[in-house]
Amino acid sequence: MIPRIMSTQHPDNYSIPFFASSPILGGEDEITEAFYAFSVLGADEQMWDFEGKEVDEFVVKKLLERYPTFFKENILGEDLRLTPRVPNPSVEKAEAKLLLETLQGITRAADYARVFYLDNIAPIFEVILPMTTSLAEMLRVHELYRKIVSLSGEVIYDVTVKEWIGEFYPKEINVIPLFETKVALLKSGRIIREYIGRKRPEYLRVFFARSDPAMNYGLLSAVTYVKKALEQVGEVEEETSTPIYPIIGVGSPPFRGGMRPENVKKVLKEYPSVQTYTIQSSFKYDHPTKDVVKAVEIVKSKKREAPDPLDIPEFIQLYEIEYQKQLKILAPYIRNIVTRIPDRRKRKLHIGLFGYSRNVGGLSLPRVIKFTASLYSIGLPPELLGLNELSDNQLDSISEYYKNLYDDLEFAMRFFSFKVAERVGLRELSEKVKEFKPDIDDEYVREAELVFRGQGDVMKLAQIRGFLG
C-alpha cells in the first residue's frame, strides 16, 4: 500500500486546532495531530519532521500506548505510515548528528512495535532526505543505516551488542529523495536512474517540492520544472520497469500548489501522475472537517494517470529574471511585515537550503510560508510577480501544460492592490494585471493597504483568503 495522502506539519494555518494547547503546535499536540490525521481525516501517512523542528522522538511509543485499539486494527508500518524527514548533513551541518539519532530511533520504534504487535513489524522504514542533489547523498544514508544495524555483531567488552541490547530491525530502510532546486529537479531523472541501477529496489518513492521552487524561481517556473521532473520519472519507470511513486509537496495558495479541499480535483488534474499528495495544516484546520474528509476521499478514490509531456520554454528564463528583480524591490517590505506573521509550529534555529532565512538571488528572505503570507498581507500575491515579462501568447503556451494557470492567476488577482504595486515601483506589473480585468475583493484590498501602512489586521486577511501562507 503506497499512501495517497501524507499529512505534514507545515505551519500554513490561521485557525488553531481544537486539540491544541497553544497556538504554536509542538510536542504532545503533534502526537494528537498524527492520530487525528489517521483516524478522522483519513490520511494514510504522517510526515514526522526532524528537519529544523522540535518533534517528539518517542512518537511511535506514544501513539501505540495512547490509541491501542485504533492501531491494533490499523497497523503502523503496514496500513499506515509514519515517515521522518531527516536533516541532510551535506547542507545542514549544525543538525548533522540528528540524522544519526533519527536512524537509531527507527530501530527503537521497531522494538516498541514488536512488543505491541507481537511480531516483527517496522513502523518506520523510510526516511525523506531533503535538498537531495546527488546519488551519493542517498547512498550515504543507506550505508549509515547499515552500519548502525551491523553493530549488533560487535563485541563490547565480553558480550555482543545483540546479546546485550537486542537485535536491530529493520535490516534496511528506503530513502526518499526530496528534490527542491531547479538543478536538482531537472536532473532528478538521472539520479533516480543511477539509484535504481545501484540498489535494484522493488519500488521507489520520489518527493518533489513545490513551495521553495516557487519562491526561488517564480510560480510559472516552479510548475514547469516540477512537471518536467515528473515526466522524467515516468520515463525512468518505463525504462527500468521499477515502480516509481512520486510525492508532491503542495500547500494551500496557488503559489505553493493550490491544495485546498475545494480545489483537490484541479490539483489532481494538474499533477495526474503523482501518487502521494501532502495535506498541510491549513488544509486540515482552516476548513470544516467534513469538507476535509470528503476531499481526502476524492484523492484516494482517483487513479494515477500518465504524466504530462512538455518542453521547457526558452522565455521562462526571462520570466525568472523579472521575478527575481521584483523580489529585490519587495525584500525590504517583506522583512518589515514578516514580524507580524504569527508562528504556528515550534522551530529550531534552522540551517536549511538557504539558512533560517532563505537566500534568493543574494536576498535574505523568510521561509516560504511567511514569505507568501507577507506578500498576500500587503496586497501583492507572489503568484503575480514577473507576470509582466510574458506576452499573452507566451502565457497561452504555458497554459497548454499548466492547466490551472488562468484559474490560479484569477484567484491571486482578487487580492491584488494596484495602489501598493504602484507605490513600491511595480507599475508594469500593475498594468499587466489590469489587462485581466480582475474581480477584486475590495474589503480585502482596503485592509491590505492598511497593513502596508503599518496598521491593519494580517489575520483578518488570512481568514478572508482561507490560509496563512
From Swiss-Prot:
<dbReference type="Pfam" id="PF14010">
    <property type="entry name" value="PEPcase_2"/>
</dbReference>
<dbReference type="GO" id="GO:0006107">
    <property type="term" value="P:oxaloacetate metabolic process"/>
</dbReference>
<protein>
    <recommendedName>
        <fullName>Phosphoenolpyruvate carboxylase</fullName>
        <ecNumber>4.1.1.31</ecNumber>
    </recommendedName>
</protein>
<dbReference type="GO" id="GO:0000287">
    <property type="term" value="F:magnesium ion binding"/>
</dbReference>
<keyword id="KW-0120">Carbon dioxide fixation</keyword>
<keyword id="KW-0456">Lyase</keyword>
<dbReference type="InterPro" id="IPR015813">
    <property type="entry name" value="Pyrv/PenolPyrv_kinase-like_dom"/>
</dbReference>
<comment type="similarity">
    <text>Belongs to the PEPCase type 2 family.</text>
</comment>
<keyword id="KW-0460">Magnesium</keyword>
<dbReference type="GO" id="GO:0006099">
    <property type="term" value="P:tricarboxylic acid cycle"/>
</dbReference>
<dbReference type="GO" id="GO:0008964">
    <property type="term" value="F:phosphoenolpyruvate carboxylase activity"/>
</dbReference>
<comment type="function">
    <text>Catalyzes the irreversible beta-carboxylation of phosphoenolpyruvate (PEP) to form oxaloacetate (OAA), a four-carbon dicarboxylic acid source for the tricarboxylic acid cycle.</text>
</comment>
<dbReference type="InterPro" id="IPR007566">
    <property type="entry name" value="PEP_COase_arc-type"/>
</dbReference>
<dbReference type="GO" id="GO:0015977">
    <property type="term" value="P:carbon fixation"/>
</dbReference>
<comment type="subunit">
    <text>Homotetramer.</text>
</comment>
